[in-house]
Amino acid sequence: MPPPIREQIAEHAREELPNESCGLLLLEDGQAVEYVRAENADASPYRFTLYLDPIRWSEIELDQAVVHSHVSAPPRPSRTDVENIGLWQGRPYLIYSIARDELAAWTIEDGSIEPLQLG
């Protein structure tokens, strides 16, 4: 994970307090190349629904990973994350913990959670 992109994720998370932040990590050949801020349509400290302008989303041609923050919990998928995985099932799923200043990556598929290495 390039340090400038990690810092953009952390900065966005801090700015959205007390709510969770969310966004997209754009990937080229499996490597992070850009962080795109999105809106948490739930405006909640406990859950998120990612909203990105549909026109902006349609312009993205790279692979995508979802990113969201946990305000006080560790950067591990919560039960809510697993139950609401939706279209992110099987894709890289990154969580930034504001309280711990930690970023971790996972895949969630059919209720199974597997860690991913951040490059």
Regions found by a protein language model. Name each.
Residues 1-63, 72-119:
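Conserved beta-strand-loop surface patch within small alpha/beta domains used
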Residues 69:
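Extracytoplasmic ligand/sensor domains, especially the bilobed periplasmic-binding protein
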